[in-house]
Amino acid sequence: MRWVLPDHIQDALPSEAASLEALRRRLLDAFRVRGYQLVMPPLLEYLDSLTTGAGQDLKLRTFKLVDQVSGRTMGVRADMTPQVTRIDAHLLNRAGVSRLCYCGSVLHTLPSTLTATREPLQLGAELYGHAGIDADIEIVRLLADVLRLAEVPASRIDIGHVGLFHALAALAGMVPEREEELFDLLQAKDVPGLKEITVGVAEPVRTALLRLPALYGGAEVIDEAAACMPESAEIRAALDDLRRLAAALEDLPISFDLADLRGYHYHSGVVFAAYGGGSPAALALGGRYDRVGEAFGRARPATGFSLDLRELALRLPAAVVPGAILAPLEGTAGLAAAVEALRAAGEAVMSRLPGHEGTWNDAGCDRQLVMRQGAWVVEPLQGE
């Protein structure tokens, strides 16, 4: 059947498309007034550029094809963040802070969940050039503002720090393969598995690793972590970052999950996930990723977030698309001026093509432009 789409690929019909576009404009305008400049990376690039500095999961999610011009392997973007990082590092080449935003379709080889689309409409913001925690504070607050403007306010923003995991894994002396296994166990909060894999790890490192899954809650979690962590400059710096975030964002619904390490291959510091709208899955993900720009010849401090606009729109009431005005195809003097005046006021006006009586309501018309006593007026459309 030629009209059947692949699994997890959907059309956006007029009402949904109108809702998505209105949401896109509103959020991009919010970025603009906060100093974030819009960039539009290409849909496909050479594969090594798209996946450089990213984890294995991004490589597996990327569709691949052969470029008929160069013979090189290309990929359809699965995440726009590496592209924006390339633009900052290699094209803009700014010395100071750079704030960039973006919105576009990405394509995934597999859906992220059973109900997810394989063509998310990714929207995000990135802040480059500032290594301090002030940049992370700005980005988390921007995310909260964006969700509020989208009318899906965050009910919870979970914050973690991959620096804690990296420091503990290094102190435990784990080889990369063992570190991967440890990461998987922490993500699953598999305490029996953690006890088994940490046999032989010296104290207090082992105790700290076993405590991580339970370190979830309010700002008090940071002090609990400090009490059980070994002495380390990296651990001390990570906990200081979390304390500053807790103090600066106390008006937001933030919590701390020190075992949440999603994207730890990619991120280098603070990580966060926002929840809301009754969704069990995160609406937005973000964090610091200072090392990714190295692949493009220029390492820059970087932090940001992204979300799927389609998923966000599902949490909103169905959009009410304003009806259009049906105008005569031809009329007396003044018709063209009347139509243009209505369009200038934001109304949709379409011409009544002959031979389609009885179908104009289906086409979206709910009013008509008619001549009454020498003047063009708008009236309800009846029986069309």
From Swiss-Prot:
Pathway(s): Amino-acid biosynthesis; L-histidine biosynthesis; L-histidine from 5-phospho-alpha-D-ribose 1-diphosphate: step 1/9
Main location: cytoplasm
GO cellular component: cytoplasm
GO BP terms in the entry: L-histidine biosynthetic process
Subcellular location: Cytoplasm
UniProt keyword list: Amino-acid biosynthesis, Cytoplasm, Histidine biosynthesis
Gene3D superfamilies named among the record's database cross-references: Bira Bifunctional Protein, Domain 2
Domain of life from the UniProt record: Bacteria
Assembly information from the UniProt record: Heteromultimer composed of HisG and HisZ subunits.
Function: Required for the first step of histidine biosynthesis. May allow the feedback regulation of ATP phosphoribosyltransferase activity by histidine.
Classification via NCBIfam families: hisZ_biosyn_reg, PRK12292.1-1, PRK12421.1
Similarity-based family: Belongs to the class-II aminoacyl-tRNA synthetase family. HisZ subfamily.
Any further remark recorded for this protein: This function is generally fulfilled by the C-terminal part of HisG, which is missing in some bacteria such as this one.
Protein name in UniProt: ATP phosphoribosyltransferase regulatory subunit
Organism: Azoarcus sp. (strain BH72)
